[in-house]
Amino acid sequence: MDTVAPQRFRAVMSHFTTGVTVVTANSPAGPVGMTANAVCSLSLEPLLLLVCFANEARTLPLIAGTRRFGVNVLAAGQEDLARLFASKLPEDQKFAGVQHSLHDGIPVLDGALAWVGCRLEQLVPGGDHRIGIGAVTAAEGEPLLWYRGEFR
């Protein structure tokens, strides 16, 4: 059987376009978050969402502890937020100066295109990641549309 080097696989998968999100939770020490792009809708009945967390992600045990998290879909122009929440900064520093509000106890980033609130149902091992399955408890967002020559 042929094997593929991890670097080759990563390079090939870099051609797959995906959205960028920040997964957030409200821990006992305050809001926490991490950038994630391995996010997708899993089921409509029941409403389930899937997020992949690196096993070493510092946000993972905090989400596992609270059992609640939010997925903030970033808009064009929010690259700085994506980089900030992907950084190795301590969790308590990531939210310093970041405008957000709490919706049902879940941090929602100002300017996010959309957000989904979830209750963590299951964490499934998947190699060097954990696959988080969340039951959707809230969803908000207004898409930017182009119709008949103007934004709507």
State each model region's role.
Residues M1-R152:
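Basic, polyanion-binding surface patches
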